[in-house]
Amino acid sequence: FVSLKMMLDQAELEELIPVDPCRRVKPPRVEPTETRILSPDQPKQLIEAVPNRGAKRRGPALTVDVDESWMLLFELAFAAGMREGERYALMPYELEQRDGVPGINVQQQIQQYGKPEDAVIPAWLKAEHLYGILWLTTPKTHAAHRFVPISTSLWQRLWARIKRLGIGPRDLIFTNSRGNPVRSSTERYNWNKALKAAGLPPVTIHSARHWTASMTARANMPDDARTAIMGHTSISMTNHYTHRDTASLAALLDQAIPDLHDDTDIIEAEIIEETA
């Protein structure tokens, strides 16, 4: 409903329709569904299982390059909390160092808007056609344009791939075997294969962002920092992505609640056996 209303609002602004009919409609009630996420140590198991996932190999690309591609894409999903379209659109020029801190200046995304003759793209987005129904566009909100710090190790592995494959500043770091943009269906296939190889529960790719939001909460990161990393416009949205695990809740509650009982004061109960 929200997406439809946004499109109709824009159509009204561009005078394509006289009025947005959604204004007179009560939004449907949507029951939230809980997103299952991996435990803190399981993403590493998933990434390490990529070479053993048993996926079908297609195209001329070397197996090591294909495996590396998925391992890096999965790591970016967890470590940087990047959206699927942001990871698929990643180019070397977005890799920056600020104050000596390596990171990604998220400036673009890949989205499906249809073939050029059929595409309907919101006026506030700058868009460039890439391939088929895929378009390279600016982020959907101002907050989505953000700098996300990454580890030195991840930074070095990204640049090693860029240099080894001769990827230009404005070329996609991740492509399929034909050099075209990664498709979500292909990533989902390899993701599920890696989950199975690692013996992990079935979770969605999008759950990686929920995992990132949850881990930042577990680390007691300030709300403004959490929303900045996630690219959200409000903390309420970030909280929607956050899942407090039992261990962290127990630790926080243990810090907050003082001891209410002296364990040294033990009452011994006498057990009386009844005889028939």
Question: Model segments located where?
Answer:
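Non-catalytic DNA-binding core/recognition domains of DNA-processing enzymes
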Residues: F1-Q10, V25, I150
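Surface-exposed alpha-helical interface segments used for non-catalytic interactions
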Residues: V2, R23, K44, Q156, ...
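Arg/Lys-rich amphipathic alpha helix in sigma70-family domain 2
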Residues: D9-P18, A160-K163
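Basic, Lys/Arg- and aromatic-enriched nucleic-acid-binding interface segment
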Residues: L13, I17-L90, Q97-V101, W135, ...
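Helix-turn-helix-type domain boundary/helix-start signal
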Residues: E15, R36-I37, V148, N180, ...
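C-terminal secondary-structure termini that scaffold catalytic or DNA-interacting sites
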Residues: E48-K56, P60-A61, D99, I110-H145, ...
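Short, basic (Lys/Arg/His-rich) helix/loop patches that form interaction surfaces
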Residues: E48-W70, A80, V148, Q156, ...
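Short, polar N-cap/turn motifs at the start of nucleic acid-interacting alpha helices
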Residues: E94-G103, P201-P202, M221-H240, T264
